[in-house]
């Protein structure tokens, strides 16, 4: 399923040194789907965690360890180097851990070449509540909206109809009763 946001994900990937990427959006708008598709298509290796299912990682980030110590333990838990160019680290449901959200600043400053992307339901609500811990300026945020009509037609492989709608719109003419 093609989504317009995919091009933004490609632009983020093409930057040699980039901030962690956070996808914001309402529940069930396709955040996990599009991130999974992007990760599978664009990276050789994907390390994916869902914080709703990884209480061990949530607890790790609630400790008083230094950021370096937490990161080293995270790599051990996941059995992955995480910093290789061909690896992307996908954290789903990141809203579960406000401390891990705050730790994104560490990833940005200390591991700028690391490919890290995160998403979560109700993330925007959670961010508004905890602005003091959010790493302002250290995370790139992109909004994902529910599928629009153009994306819907593309998903249904209705490219001819889409082109005709655009043609009618640009010429300011009616489509006709049969197609409307």
PLM segments and residue spans:
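Hydrophobic anchor at the beta1->P-loop junction of P-loop NTPases
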Residues: 23
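Structural recognition of the conserved hydrophobic beta-strand(s) that form the central parallel beta-sheet
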Residues: 90, 115-121, 143, 152
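Interdomain motor-coupling "hinge/lid" segment immediately C-terminal to the ATP-binding subdomain
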Residues: 129-180
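Hydrophobic positions on the alpha1 helix immediately C-terminal to the Walker A/P-loop
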Residues: 34, 38
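Short glycine-rich substrate-engagement loop in P-loop NTPases that contacts/grips substrate
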Residues: 53-85
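Conserved P-loop NTPase "ATPase switch" module shared by AAA+ and STAND
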Residues: 81-100
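Conserved lysine of the Walker
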Residues: 31
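Pre-Walker A adenine-sensing motif
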Residues: 1-16
């Amino acid at each position: 399923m093609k989504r317009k946001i995919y091009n933004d994900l490609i632009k983020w990937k093409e930057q040699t040194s980039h901030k962690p990427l956070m996808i914001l959006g309402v529940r069930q708008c396709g955040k996990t789907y599009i991130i999974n598709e992007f990760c599978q298509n664009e990276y050789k290796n994907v390390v994916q965690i869902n914080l709703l299912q990884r209480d061990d990682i949530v607890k790790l980030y609630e400790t008083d360890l230094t950021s370096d110590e937490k990161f080293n333990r995270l790599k051990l838990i996941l059995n992955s180097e995480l910093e290789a160019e061909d690896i992307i680290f996908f954290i789903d449901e990141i809203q579960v851990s406000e401390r891990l959200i705050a730790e994104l600043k560490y990833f940005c400053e200390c591991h700028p070449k690391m490919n890290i992307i995160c998403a979560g339901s109700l993330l925007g609500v959670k961010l508004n509540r905890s602005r003091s811990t959010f790493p302002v300026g250290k995370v790139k945020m992109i909004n994902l909206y529910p599928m629009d009509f153009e994306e819907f037609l593309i998903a249904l492989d209705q490219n001819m109809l889409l082109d005709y709608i655009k043609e009618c719109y640009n010429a300011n003419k009616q489509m006709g009763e049969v197609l409307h």
